[in-house]
């Protein structure tokens, strides 16, 4: 069944800020196998001019919680996650994410397009501090297999 195009343009904003913590950064760095001392050692991060531990660039994927109320989680969209594969994910950092940041995430379903028998959903994200500073932007593409409307 084709996805509900009425969802394009819908935005959702997290109600609770995402708390960037030192241990969360360290765990993520270990999980991706990155030994960069800026991700693990507070003194090294401070010596490099940062306020605290620096998060790896892809760390922001952990700031997109499933309970955010993402457009892709709304049953009325018609997305069946058993048919979904991850297509692409990109982040543009305007400054490093550091321990102590409190981030508000806004997600918008930017587009749904047909590619053959599949549909590609692109969701855009804005990560701002609780004071409104834009820290990063991102996009995520999901492929919904076999759901494109017939031609």
UniProtKB/Swiss-Prot annotation:
Q: Which residues form the MaoC-like domain?
A: 8-127
List where the protein spans the membrane.
Answer: none
Q: Which residues form a coiled coil?
A: none
Q: Name one GO biological process term.
A: fatty acid biosynthetic process
Q: Which cysteines are joined by disulfide bonds?
A: none
One Pfam family here:
FAS1_DH_region
The molecular function terms in GO held by this entry are: (3R)-hydroxyacyl-[acyl-carrier-protein] dehydratase activity
Q: Write down the superkingdom of origin.
A: Bacteria
- What family classification does the UniProt entry report for this protein? Belongs to the UPF0336 family.
Task: State the protein's name.
Answer: UPF0336 protein Franean1_6066
Q: What is the lineage of its organism?
A: Bacteria, Bacillati, Actinomycetota, Actinomycetes, Frankiales
